[in-house]
Regions:
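Bacterial N-terminal signal peptides that target proteins for export
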Residues: 1-7
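Short polybasic amphipathic segments
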Residues: 34-54
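Short, solvent-exposed loop/turn elements at domain surfaces
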Residues: 69-74, 96-101, 178-180
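C-terminal motif of bacterial Sec signal peptides marking the signal peptidase cleavage site
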Residues: 17-18
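Repetitive helical segments and hydrophobic/amphipathic motifs
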Residues: 11-14
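N-terminal post-signal-peptidase region of extra-cytosolic proteins
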Residues: 28, 32-37, 61-82, 87, ...
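Exported/periplasmic cell-wall-interacting domains
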Residues: 80, 100-218
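Short Gly/aromatic-enriched secondary-structure transition segments
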Residues: 55-68, 102-107
Length: 218
């Protein structure tokens, strides 16, 4: 961890050009090899990276983060700000996998089957920037909720007539030149190929720790 912050990420979030979500309780990493660790470099964003255990070996991956900087532990999610702290995985979505905490399924007002068949595709079909581009979440979406939980602005709702959900998350991208930059709506983005590997090796309740080499700015 680095000096200014081992900040255990708190907040479930990311919206529009970024992401978002909702809170839950804590539980140790089911990987049995420690948490996923993400360190944001505010001086050199291109050196921001994450580490995770994969089949007994270390996996290292590049990440991008919020265009408006880094939020303090325990803060409420703001557009464009990536929160620091400790989080747990409360939803995993991709073409081949759908898992979500039961409390979120109940909150959605939909059945698990409906969410499994529609939610990620709906979320990924939205043109957030109005430029005709979709697929901003890339190949998958790992939702994170802060530990301990704090109030967050994440809801299931409609955006331009499309049923969706938003939260703080790790997700893929439709433009890999955005990785290693401060460009997201608050979420952490990574290359799709690496995200696919990560999704195969995580479970609900796994721990994610987000830190920074500089103090939070919000």
């Amino acid at each position: 961890m680095r000096v200014a912050q081992m900040l255990m990420v708190t907040s479930s979030a990311l919206m529009l050009s970024g992401c978002m979500q909702q809170p839950n309780t804590t539980k140790g990493s089911s990987q049995g090899e420690g948490p996923i660790k993400i360190e944001l470099n505010q001086l050199l964003p291109q050196e921001s990276q994450g580490t995770a255990a994969k089949e007994g070996k270390g996996m290292v991956f590049e990440v991008g983060y919020g265009k408006n900087g880094v939020g303090c532990i325990g803060s409420t999610f703001e557009e464009g700000v990536t929160p620091l702290g400790t989080f747990k995985v409360n939803a995993i979505m991709s073409k081949d996998r759908f898992e979500m905490d039961e409390s979120l399924i109940q909150q959605s007002g939909k059945t698990k089957n409906y969410l499994s068949e529609n939610l990620f595709n709906n979320m990924n079909s939205i043109d957030f920037k109005g430029d005709g581009e979709t697929g901003e979440y890339g190949s998958g979406y790992i939702s994170l909720t802060p530990v301990p939980s704090t109030p967050q602005p994440f809801n299931f709702n409609e955006y331009d007539g499309t049923y969706r959900w938003y939260s703080f998350a790790i997700h893929g991208t439709n433009d890999e030149t955005r990785i290693g930059k401060r460009v997201t709506g608050g979420c952490i983005n990574m290359k799709n190929k690496q995200l696919n590997k990560l999704i195969k090796n995580i479970n609900l309740g796994d721990e994610v720790i987000v830190t920074s080499n500089q103090p939070c700015n919000r």
